[in-house]
Amino acid sequence: VTRVRELTGAGINVSFGHDDIFDPWYPMGTGSLRDVVFMGLHVCQMMGYGDIMNSCKFISTNAAKTLHLGDSYGVREGNPASFIVLDAKNYYDALNRSAAVRLSCKNGRALAETEPAAARVRF
């Protein structure tokens, strides 16, 4: 594993990703970028609140920069409406609780929805 904290601290763009989904090289791969960030934070020992809150950049804006997406990435008029909505208060909460994807849209079309879970703790 490379020195993610040091590289980002030096202003170098770092992004996370993977392409192994249920294959011989990584049979546990699900395609979940949340899992990639979760593992990356642990392996790189980036457990501070700020580290965790900023880690979404590794799979979003930093990844877009790595892929040279330019102005075609991000929420702005004229761009494709491709996004997910997580069942969480913020990004820390999303990682901490493995928040479900409530809505997944690609080019403005809803691909998948998940109803909120109802949970009760009984003592």
List each language-model region with its residue ranges:
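C-terminal cap of metal-dependent C-N hydrolases
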Residues: 77-123
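His/Asp/Glu-enriched, well-ordered alpha-helical/loop segment
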Residues: 2-86
